[in-house]
Amino acid sequence: MSAKWEKKGTNDGVLTFSIEQAVIEKGLTQAFNKVKKNLNVPGFRKGKVSRTVFNRMYGEEALYEDALNAVLPEAYEAAVLEAGIEPVAQPKIDVESMNKGEDWVITAEVTVKPEVKLGEYKNLTVSKQDREVTDEDVEARLKREQESQAELVIKEDAAAENGDTVVIDFEGFLGDEAFEGGKGENYSLELGSNSFIPGFEDQLVGKKAGEEVEVNVTFPEDYQAEDLAGKEAVFKVTVHEVKAKELPELDDEFAKDVDDSVESLDELKEKFRKELTEAKEAAAEEAKDEEAIRLAVENAEIVELPHVMVHDEVHRSMDEFLNNMQRQGISPEMYYQLTGSTEEDLHKQFEGEAETRTKTNLVIEAVAKAENIEVTQEDIDAEVKDLAEQYNMPEAQVRKVLNNDMLEHDIRMKRAVETITETAVEK
């Protein structure tokens, strides 16, 4: 095997390599064994013709294509290793020569990972994060819990106020014609929740049960239903009931109803404070880590990102997003219809994020290389054990899903990230 790498562009080049006679012969044997199974030759039983007879009748060249397909993947991988390059996409293969009795010469047009010139990535200065939990934070959490425990009580002959819930029938019209999706019966709407079109809820404030009212609105220009976007509409609304929230008393009984592990309101407040502190600490650490990584990426220099890397990352993001939609019962076609968008729009939406993620991954890989981060088999075994416990599955199953190379790469990336984040200083 001899391999030669010739750079043609920032991230592109041509890899020329040869396939030796011994390897070619192995490929020819595989190709012949595949072909002869279905070969009918006079004087021979089906599939029993000899290689010599085949070559005399059809010529050895008839096997070249299948032979090349058999040996090319391994030969290409060996050439890549010898040349010391890291391809990021499938190569475009061309045959330079396939002469009998000579090594075959192959060329491959290859896109490789771009060069990353690291800047500062250790001891980076990041913004000081807010980790303090105040009494106001605890009271706000308590208030949310109180709101969630509230009961709705009918207001007899009383006008609706913001915060009240009205039970309504409604039907929307464009001019004199009702439009699809604009009708509802016995719908509970909290006034001030902004869950309806802007202006709709405001016009129900002050109304009482039994009243009928016409609500005039204008749909937003960016409304998801294109046939309604920017248009004026009238909703005929009947108010059936007006309900007010009745909040429970903030006392020890309330505390025990919320959490049976506490005996008093003070205990509940302390538990909330602890939970809020843990959450704020986790959020602060995450924000610190994200800023440190962002700075490390900004400090690095990548002349040009290969388009194919960004393209692949976009499609990974799109597939993940659409699969999540599918799990919620929304097909891609339905999503595009509901949002008035196209596959191309979604592609553009993910492009910026994909470019950032691609740059970030390249910089983290470069840090791992610069730090000479090594991963042992013991490290891999420990990672498999952790993943098996985390996902409650046998270790053997983890190894089936993630091979050693994938696990080694993940561990190296984690340690490179830790090199950046654990040395960052808040100021």
Swiss-Prot record:
Transmembrane segments: none
Keyword set includes Cell cycle: yes
Domain (PPIase FKBP-type): residue spans on this chain: 163-248
Subcellular location: Cytoplasm
Main location as per UniProt: cytoplasm
Reaction catalyzed: [protein]-peptidylproline (omega=180) = [protein]-peptidylproline (omega=0)
Biological-process GO terms, alphabetical: 'de novo' cotranslational protein folding; cell division; chaperone-mediated protein folding; protein transport; protein unfolding
Keyword Cell inner membrane in record: no
One Gene Ontology cellular component annotation held by this UniProt entry: cytoplasm
A Pfam family that the UniProt record links to this protein: Trigger_N
E.C. designation(s): 5.2.1.8
Database matches in InterPro entries: PPIase_dom_sf, PPIase_FKBP_dom, Trig_fac, Trigger_fac_C, Trigger_fac_C_sf, Trigger_fac_ribosome-bd_bac, Trigger_fac_ribosome-bd_sf, Trigger_fact/SurA_dom_sf
SUPFAM superfamilies named among the record's database cross-references: FKBP-like (SSF54534), Triger factor/SurA peptide-binding domain-like (SSF109998), Trigger factor ribosome-binding domain (SSF102735)
UniProt keyword list: Cell cycle, Cell division, Chaperone, Cytoplasm, Isomerase, Rotamase
PANTHER family listed in its UniProt record: TRIGGER FACTOR CHAPERONE AND PEPTIDYL-PROLYL CIS/TRANS ISOMERASE (PTHR30560), TRIGGER FACTOR-LIKE PROTEIN TIG, CHLOROPLASTIC (PTHR30560:SF3)
Written domain comment of the UniProt record: Consists of 3 domains; the N-terminus binds the ribosome, the middle domain has PPIase activity, while the C-terminus has intrinsic chaperone activity on its own.
NCBIfam families: tig (TIGR00115)
Family in the record: Belongs to the FKBP-type PPIase family. Tig subfamily.
Protein's name in the database: Trigger factor
Organism: Enterococcus faecalis (strain ATCC 700802 / V583)
Protein encoded by which gene: tig
